[in-house]
């Protein structure tokens, strides 16, 4: 069942979240650099809003009697943990005085989720692209703050958009 779903529509969530994150990153980066106003960082909240909405509207038709396998549940759990972790830490970074290297944390977390998905499904492109994002993440601790969004966008391009297009 999971293999059939993988062949039919597993690329959609990768593409939705990859493109939403990439475009939001470019929007936030451009507005903050152009205006010098950090309040534009609130645009990061577009990611869960647009990503969740598009995921809902682009999901496949629900078939009656569809069996949810153990692998389906494991993948759901992997992404639930990754998503809740990313959401919680993003809210901490946006709305508290605690300073986190949030782009590093999010890229690392999502890279681990993508790599785990690839390993669980034995889909090598997702495993390798997730690993590439994990390896890219520490670079954001090294580069100047102005260039961190570029690495973040590149990481999402590699870990979500590339495997998503390979699947579709």
Sequence positions of predicted segments:
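Selected alpha-helical membrane-embedding segments in polytopic membrane proteins
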Residues: 4-92
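Hydrophobic alpha-helical transmembrane segments of multipass integral membrane proteins
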Residues: 18-22, 26, 49, 84-87, ...
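Hydrophobic alpha-helical transmembrane segments
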Residues: 27-33, 90-96, 114-121, 137-145
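Structural signature of hydrophobic alpha-helical transmembrane segments
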Residues: 39-50, 93-108, 153
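C-terminal ends of transmembrane helices
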Residues: 53-71, 112-119, 161-168
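Membrane-proximal helix-loop-helix units in multi-pass membrane proteins
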Residues: 70-130
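Terminal transmembrane helical module of multi-pass membrane proteins
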Residues: 116-168
């Amino acid at each position: 069942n999971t293999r059939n779903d993988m062949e039919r529509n597993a690329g959609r969530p990768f593409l939705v979240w990859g493109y939403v994150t990439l475009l939001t990153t470019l929007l936030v980066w451009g507005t903050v650099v152009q205006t010098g106003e950090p309040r534009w960082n609130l645009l990061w909240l577009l990611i869960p809003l647009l990503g969740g909405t598009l995921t809902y509207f682009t999901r496949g038709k629900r078939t009656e009697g569809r069996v949810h396998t153990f692998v389906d549940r494991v993948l759901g759990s992997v992404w639930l943990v990754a998503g809740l972790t990313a959401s919680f830490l993003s809210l901490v970074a946006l709305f508290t005085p605690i300073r986190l290297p949030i782009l590093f944390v999010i890229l690392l977390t999502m890279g681990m989720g993508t790599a785990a998905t690839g390993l669980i499904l034995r889909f090598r492109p997702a495993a390798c692209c997730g690993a590439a994002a994990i390896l890219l993440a520490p670079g954001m601790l090294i580069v100047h703050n102005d260039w961190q969004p570029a690495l973040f966008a590149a990481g999402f391009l590699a870990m979500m958009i590339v495997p998503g297009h390979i699947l579709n």
